[in-house]
Amino acid sequence: ISHVSDSTFYDVLKISKAPVIASHSSCRFFTPGFQRNMSDDMIRELGKNGGVIQINFGASFLDSLARVNSKVLDSLEKLLISKGLTSRDSAAQPIIDQFAMNHAELYSDVDRVADHIDHVVRLIGIDHVGIGSDFDGVGDSLPLGLKDVSDYPNLIFVLLKRGYTPEDIE
């Protein structure tokens, strides 16, 4: 239900006989007005349903500042296109890395992902939050220190530091 409107979300919960999954959404609490994320009320209702919200790692899903600065990210995409590349091309990686160094303020970080996890845990408990990443859908807007699955140890470290147990994380 990660791509549905708020009203459709509530309609789904009314008719669903099974727990519902938001496979790649985050908390609107941190991104007021960003409709793709879930409000606290939606998250609470999802918990009552037995469902799970899996946190999206895209910058615009994690932080309002990243959404404001998306025009700068658009300039990176235009640069890559001008060179006949996409963000998934290995030849683009040095360009992306340099861009990230020059514009670090545009990217969120692992701590912000953990903030979203913390928020869901406070609202509905650890059993209702997961990792949705959206690695294949958010382009080069992934958090610093969490650019691909090989960076998961960075997130695990932050969660352990915040008091989560290995069992919580599993």
List where the protein language model places each region.
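Aromatic-lined glycan-binding groove of carbohydrate-active enzymes
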Residues: S39-I95
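Mid-to-C-terminal alpha-helical segments outside catalytic/metal-binding sites
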Residues: K147-E170
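Conserved, mostly hydrophobic/aromatic
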Residues: H24, I53, D134, I169
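Intrinsically disordered, low-complexity acidic Ser/Thr-rich regulatory segments
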Residues: S90-D115
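Short acidic/histidine-rich active-site segments
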Residues: I55-F57, I124-L146
